[in-house]
């Protein structure tokens, strides 16, 4: 989606057949419409949670993006972890946090939420009207955690608007050279630089 995330009307994209994520197996290819329907399926679960801070980790890029976008739409503070290991998470976890992942330690398992109706046609399974009028705030809080040189979680706090400006700068510098290009990245989506290229 080559637009600012904070300007995206997800509801209007519910029927889009444009490619969103292309998997090399051709089995798990996702359209923008698939993505919006999965957000609509997960949104009620996130919105109903009392915790204001969601600790997020998933090695699966698609699950990661569903968690991330849905948490922001539900007005949650998003903390992006670079590992799902409990020994790491326990140092940053508190009573107002929820660990969301596809791992066994997760308090809310995203894989189960997405697989609850695998055989139902997309348009029949989910009513996307729950997303009508919802947008992601440009002032949304996003916190990255990196181990740095100490091995202990170190917090890097950003507003969504800061990240969007970084993406706009990258686009302004390189867009003509990279338009219609295929990117291969060695940096995972749960690290700040990989996040900028994969997610935003």
Predicted regions and their residues:
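Conserved AMP-binding A3 loop
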Residues: 31, 133, 141-168
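Conserved ATP-dependent adenylate/AMP-binding module captured primarily in the ANL superfamily
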Residues: 43-47, 68, 78-106, 162-184
């Amino acid at each position: 989606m080559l637009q600012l995330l904070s300007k995206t009307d997800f509801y209007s994209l519910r029927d889009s057949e444009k490619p969103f994520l292309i998997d090399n197996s051709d089995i798990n290819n996702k359209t923008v419409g698939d993505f919006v329907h999965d957000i609509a399926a997960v949104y009620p679960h996130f919105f109903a949670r009392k915790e204001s801070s969601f600790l997020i980790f998933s090695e699966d890029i698609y699950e990661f993006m569903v968690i991330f976008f849905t948490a922001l739409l539900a007005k949650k503070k998003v903390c992006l972890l670079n590992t799902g290991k409990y020994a790491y998470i326990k140092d940053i976890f508190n009573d107002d946090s929820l660990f969301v992942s596809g791992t066994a330690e997760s308090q809310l398992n995203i894989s189960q939420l997405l697989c609850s109706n695998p055989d139902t046609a997309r348009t029949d399974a989910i009513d996307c009207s729950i997303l009508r009028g919802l947008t992601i705030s440009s002032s949304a809080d996003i916190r990255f955690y990196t181990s740095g040189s100490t091995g202990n979680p170190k917090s890097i706090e950003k507003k969504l608007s800061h990240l969007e400006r970084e993406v706009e700068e990258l686009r302004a510098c390189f867009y003509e050279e990279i338009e219609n290009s295929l990117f291969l990245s060695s940096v995972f989506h749960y690290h700040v630089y990989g996040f900028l290229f994969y997610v935003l």
